[in-house]
UniProtKB/Swiss-Prot annotation:
Pfam families hit by this protein: DeoC
First-tier enzyme category under EC: lyase
Function: Catalyzes a reversible aldol reaction between acetaldehyde and D-glyceraldehyde 3-phosphate to generate 2-deoxy-D-ribose 5-phosphate.
Top-rank taxon: Bacteria
Entry annotation: catalytic residues: 89 (proton donor/acceptor), 152 (schiff-base intermediate with acetaldehyde), 181 (proton donor/acceptor)
Official protein name in the record: Deoxyribose-phosphate aldolase
Catalytic activity of the protein: 2-deoxy-D-ribose 5-phosphate = D-glyceraldehyde 3-phosphate + acetaldehyde
Amino acid sequence: MTIAKMIDHTALKPDTTKEQILTLTKEAREYGFASVCVNPTWVKLSAEQLAGAESVVCTVIGFPLGANTPEVKAFEVKDAIQNGAKEVDMVINIGALKDKDDELVERDIRAVVDAAKGKALVKVIIETCLLTDEEKVRACEIAVKAGTDFVKTSTGFSTGGATAEDIALMRKTVGPNIGVKASGGVRTKEDVEKMIEAGATRIGASAGVAIVSGEKPAKPDNY
């Protein structure tokens, strides 16, 4: 598998414009990225632009705080699928995890998994920068129990992004059959190679073109 096919080509800034989405989808077609990862408002346009392409549309759910109710997250998923999303990256209820309310964390993830079942792949963002190692392990275990397809490190909107150490811990926790996505601060081919070596099977990056072309990113982004 080429590096491009492991990358979710990402544009999640709040000031993202239509022109930027058109560029993103054009680049996805050109380079063969796994997906474009966009905010829900851009799902329909992205799906139209990628009709017939190998790249699919990924969107974010309960993003970036994870503090919506399970019911709201489930509605977001259904709306996104209706608009053409094939993958959804949800943020867990981080406060509930900190409170050791594992039942709520699981119910929250399961609401998204159930809403997406058979229609979209689910990635669960655990926001590693806010968690202890014990909490990272617990979050991954709950996500697997709830039926996720992937676990993912970060939103790119908090205090830190992906590290090889966290990827290795997540991979060890979920085993070989669940995907692990590194996201947040992955900007170069060298960064990607480190993450893959640690166990990542998907990369979230706004610098996708720079990564596959070997060029330096125009400016650093956290996601």
